[in-house]
């Protein structure tokens, strides 16, 4: 690459496409894939690459893609199939027979004799979708599951790629002779194909497919763990890109009206004028905003206490982070997005630089915690409610940051901003503010301005040049030092996890979780199920692993100097002041690959806790291991083997496989009830780890653990993604909930831990978190309008938001009828939305109608006859328009 002329280089630009429909081309996390591609192609053309045509808009780009063959077989015309690139069956069969015997066998068992029957032309050759553009090939990554028997996921998570999958990459390498590929955005499926986790061999499908073809991979810089897999299993040169822009959610529609009325009530209560008369109005507004679904009011309840809860909840919603668009590769933030982006980078402390909101609370001689927990109360000195004070703080901080921005981030701009009325305060406070503003001008802004290096380094990689490495993680979680983006990012040393900081976070989360369970159930949980992923632990210094250990009453020992974990020690019951709680971990395949030592560490901790000579009331781990050991011994199992099997608590994917399987069966619509979801969850995740065991399939042990769970939990440590950002959250955590309901015959308590604010961690139920995200983001005009600015990809993400909500409801029953109704009214049936989606992505609009109709058909909600008919008509009308467009292509 370094020696070749750019004009001679052949580059394949590969868009991820999951599910394999025209509605999801370029399905990359947080990225406007099409606009990024347009800008990349313009830069490449300037640098001498041979490109004949660059679409002017994302609509024109997707029109170009879908006017040629794609993965969406249902939309492919005869003409598109005829004009499509092809690999001859003869060439593919010859290549196939050079593969390792085991790799051949697994593919033929799944897909039949080469070349199979997936994406085959009338003459028996294999289709390679895409369109040629000079020396660029614009294409979609093959699906792994074309025509797969839907029941396959219930029986075997080891799904070999199709013949067409390998043919696609073979054609790129050996027929078209590509010089490099760009996999555009996080993430594709190549690096998740079966095979070894590191040191791939002739039986590992990622290596079979890609070989030594250079792989340039723009990748979401916050998604650390998955990025490591792209490096290890697909040789990716990562180009870390910024998260999607975010802002405070604020209030809107009925919630905004209710908030104003609550403030009015508080003032009238303070003066004694007419507050009592407002009670019916307030209750009506609560119902209008559907907040009575979250916070029901019963006659006889303390009304002021109830309103205080409502006010605090609204303040929490307003303070939530909401995505207000998508990132464009190499595009620095500008205008209001830059102002809001800087405020988000300052909302938590950055090393010695305090949170801007903590600093402003100090200006008013209070604390942020006081303000947020007492929203309905009137501060006598300020003559306003704390909720109004928080609104004032948001306005003042934005005004001051905007002044620095408008002044060009200079020293003079800082001086001018400090003279504003909004920046008035005592000298000591102003000194702190000045230091914070210089942090903005000297650190934040220069780092954000280097966002253009994302594009520069993509081109450097294509030129065979060095791409500077850098750390990864969440910039908005006190991570300004992680910037600039555009670097080939790395992970962490697993031997340092959990760090002392991570341990403190895990302890806080554990205490909050137990406190909430006792409040909900009146007792300690005996059995907890935890979902543990790699990336969140890398970003949080091992908080989930720490919480796992802390539940057991075990803590790490660290080496002096290096702070690597050297051993474990038992926390005495006198110090723990509670029972040792039994905890089962469901680790991801990524955790298994990137943090294998920690699976062993957690298993060692379980055995250590179980070995303590303590009463059943003080040690639930020992209690349950003893009970299960006796059952096994009664069945004839050797005593040592029985104890070992009874103490397994770490379960995950088989080596070479990834995922929880639940999203696969939900996407294929191949399920009837929770029993089906439980079956696939156990089949994919029922492999034990620990004591030298690296994924031995013991489904009955996993079923036993799942059936006994009182509580499930998955923690989040940043708000750059949430439970509706990806179907993985539901597949792992929702799948666990469904499995407990099926196998245990009960609905467990299910929590989401939140350590986004390291100084004030929190815990919510899954249903509470769903409603928080639904209200603060999914229904928020800022979110919807932000995505609408991104055309095709924005519509894709809106449709996926509805689909993931449906999937959560399927596993966990967290969607109420009114929530489906709001999705229908705001997303699918709104005339303005329909007009826009038909223009930019009609396939996504059809998917929305289909999802809502499936929910009604499965009796997950009652759409009502009128709304159901509207949705059916919408589905059919879009289908007809798409068919007409296809006929035109003929």
Where are these regions (language model features)?
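Ligand/cofactor-recognition surfaces for anionic moieties
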Residues: 1-890
């Amino acid at each position: 690459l370094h020696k070749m002329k750019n004009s001679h280089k052949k580059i394949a630009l590969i868009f991820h496409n999951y599910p394999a429909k025209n509605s999801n081309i370029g399905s990359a996390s947080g990225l406007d894939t099409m606009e990024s591609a347009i800008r990349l192609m313009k830069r490449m053309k300037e640098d001498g690459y041979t490109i004949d045509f660059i679409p002017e808009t994302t609509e024109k780009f997707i029109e170009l893609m879908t006017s040629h063959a794609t993965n969406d077989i249902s939309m492919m015309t005869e003409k598109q199939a005829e004009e499509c690139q092809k690999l001859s069956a003869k060439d593919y069969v010859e290549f196939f027979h050079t593969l390792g015997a085991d790799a051949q066998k697994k593919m033929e068992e799944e897909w039949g004799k080469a070349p199979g029957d997936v994406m085959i032309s009338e003459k028996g050759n294999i289709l390679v979708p895409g369109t040629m553009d000079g020396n660029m090939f614009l294409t979609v990554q093959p699906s792994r599951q074309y025509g797969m028997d839907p029941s396959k996921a219930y029986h075997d998570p080891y799904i070999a790629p199709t013949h067409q999958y390998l043919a696609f990459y073979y054609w790129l390498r050996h027929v078209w002779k590509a010089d490099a590929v760009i996999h555009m955005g996080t993430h594709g499926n190549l690096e998740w194909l079966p095979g070894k986790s590191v040191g791939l061999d002739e039986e590992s499908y990622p290596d079979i497919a890609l070989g030594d073809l250079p792989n340039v991979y723009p990748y979401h810089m916050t998604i650390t763990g998955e990025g490591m897999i792209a490096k290890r299993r697909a040789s990716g040169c990562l180009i870390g890109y910024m998260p999607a822009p975010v802002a405070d959610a604020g209030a809107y529609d009925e919630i905004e009206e209710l908030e104003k009325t609550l403030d009015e009530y508080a003032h009238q209560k303070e003066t004694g004028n007419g507050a009592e008369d407002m009670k019916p109005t307030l209750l009506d507004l609560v119902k209008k905003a559907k907040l009575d679904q979250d916070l029901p009011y019963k006659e006889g309840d303390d009304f002021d206490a109830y309103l205080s809860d409502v006010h605090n909840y609204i303040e929490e919603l307003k303070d939530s982070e909401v995505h207000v668009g998508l990132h464009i590769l190499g595009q620095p933030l500008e205008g209001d997005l830059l102002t809001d982006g800087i405020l988000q980078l300052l909302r938590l402390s950055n090393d010695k630089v305090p949170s801007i909101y903590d600093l402003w609370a100090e200006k008013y001689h209070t604390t942020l915690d006081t303000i947020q927990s007492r929203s309905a109360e009137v501060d006598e000195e300020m003559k306003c409610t704390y909720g109004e004070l928080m609104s004032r703080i948001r306005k003042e901080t934005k005004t001051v940051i905007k002044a620095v921005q408008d002044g060009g981030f200079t020293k003079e701009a800082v001086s001018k901003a400090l003279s504003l009325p909004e920046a008035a305060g005592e000298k000591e406070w102003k000194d702190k503010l000045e230091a914070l503003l210089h942090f903005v001008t000297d650190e934040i802004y220069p780092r954000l301005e280097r966002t253009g290096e994302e594009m520069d380094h993509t081109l450097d990689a294509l030129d065979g040049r060095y791409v500077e490495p850098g750390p990864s993680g969440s910039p908005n979680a006190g991570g300004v030092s992680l910037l600039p983006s555009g670097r080939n990012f790395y992970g962490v040393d697993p031997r340092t996890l959990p760090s002392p900081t991570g341990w403190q976070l895990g302890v806080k989360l554990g205490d909050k979780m137990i406190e909430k369970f006792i409040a909900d159930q009146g007792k300690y949980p005996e059995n907890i199920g935890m979902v543990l992923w790699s990336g969140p632990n890398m970003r949080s210094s091992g908080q989930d692993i720490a919480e796992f250990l802390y539940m057991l009453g075990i803590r790490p020992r660290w080496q002096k100097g290096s702070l690597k974990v050297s051993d474990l020690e038992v926390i005495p019951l006198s110090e723990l002041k509670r029972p040792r709680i039994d905890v089962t971990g469901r680790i991801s395949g990524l955790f298994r690959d990137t943090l294998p030592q920690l699976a062993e560490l957690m298993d060692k901790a379980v055995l250590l806790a179980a070995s303590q000579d303590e009463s059943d009331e003080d040690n639930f781990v020992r209690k349950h291991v003893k009970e299960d050991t006796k059952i096994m011994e009664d069945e004839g199992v050797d005593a040592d083997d029985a104890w070992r099997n009874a103490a397994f608590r770490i379960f995950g994917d088989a080596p070479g496989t990834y995922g929880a399987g639940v999203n696969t069966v939900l996407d294929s619509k191949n399920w009837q009830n929770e029993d089906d979801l439980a079956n696939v969850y156990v089949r994919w995740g029922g492999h034990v780890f620990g004591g030298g065991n690296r994924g031995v399939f013991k489904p009955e042990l996993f079923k036993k653990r799942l059936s006994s769970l009182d509580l499930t939990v998955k923690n989040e440590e940043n708000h750059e993604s949430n439970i509706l950002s990806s179907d993985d959250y539901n597949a792992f955590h929702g799948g666990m909930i469904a499995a407990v309901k099926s196998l245990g015959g009960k609905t467990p308590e299910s929590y989401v831990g939140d350590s986004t604010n390291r100084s004030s961690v929190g815990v919510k139920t899954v249903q509470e978190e769903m409603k928080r995200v639904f209200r603060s983001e999914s229904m928020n005009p800022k979110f919807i309008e932000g995505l609408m600015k991104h055309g095709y990809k924005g519509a894709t993400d809106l449709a996926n938001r509805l689909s993931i909500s449906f999937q959560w409801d399927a596993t966990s029953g967290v969607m109420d009828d009114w929530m489906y109704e709001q999705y229908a009214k705001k997303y699918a049936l709104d005339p303005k939305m329909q007009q826009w989606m038909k223009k930019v992505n009609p396939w996504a609009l059809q998917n929305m109608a289909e999802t809502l109709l499936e929910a009604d058909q499965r009796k997950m909600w009652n759409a009502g006859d009128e709304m159901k008919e509207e949705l059916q008509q919408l589905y059919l009308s879009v289908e007809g328009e798409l068919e007409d467009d296809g006929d035109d292509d003929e």
